[in-house]
């Protein structure tokens, strides 16, 4: 008896995997083309800035809940921009061709020292120290 082999058939799992990879490639290549490369760069810069402010706020809140004199050193990936603080509001903004302003409200007053302006995308060092029940000093290094 002859057995016929069916050639050219692929499994359903492989075909779904192949279509998923193909769709991911089309989206990855098409997004900058549809919206422009500058738009993609600005969105990624704003996303990185939001993550930097969130990480800074999280660590300030962590230090503020500890005893006086507690110090923590934090490394933060940061896009170009300027850090600022007004009482208990922490903010990061950027002017120029890509403009944004990201703020976060903390439970404790913030005193910001050091080099507050970041000129190029880099990892900055933040030394966060609790000085009393109502104030935290944040010193930025690049």
From Swiss-Prot:
Pfam families linked: Class_IIIsignal
Subcellular location: Secreted; Cell surface; Fimbrium
Motif QXSXEXXXL location, chain numbering: 9-17
Post-translational modification (record): The N-terminus is cleaved by the prepilin peptidase EppA, which recognizes the class III signal sequence.
Primary site of residence: secreted
Propeptide residues per the UniProt entry: 1-8
Any one GO cellular component localisation term in the record: cell surface
Keywords of this entry: Fimbrium, Secreted
Family matches, as InterPro entries: Class3_signal_pept_motif
Domain observations: Contains an amino terminal motif QXSXEXXXL, which is part of a class III signal sequence.
Protein name (Swiss-Prot/TrEMBL): Probable pilin MJ0832.1
């Amino acid at each position: 008896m002859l057995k016929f082999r069916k050639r050219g058939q692929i499994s359903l799992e492989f075909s779904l995997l192949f279509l998923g990879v193909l769709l991911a490639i089309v989206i990855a290549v098409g997004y900058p083309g549809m919206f422009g490369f500058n738009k993609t760069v600005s969105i990624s810069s704003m996303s990185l800035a939001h993550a930097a402010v969130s990480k800074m706020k999280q660590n300030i809140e962590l230090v503020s809940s500890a005893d006086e004199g507690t110090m923590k050193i934090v490394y933060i990936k940061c896009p170009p921009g300027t850090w600022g603080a007004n009482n208990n509001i922490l903010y990061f903004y950027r002017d120029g061709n890509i403009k944004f302003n990201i703020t976060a409200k903390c439970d404790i007053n913030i005193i910001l020292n050091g080099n507050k302006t970041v000129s190029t995308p880099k990892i900055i060092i933040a030394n966060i120290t609790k000085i009393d029940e109502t104030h935290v000093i944040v010193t930025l290094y690049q």
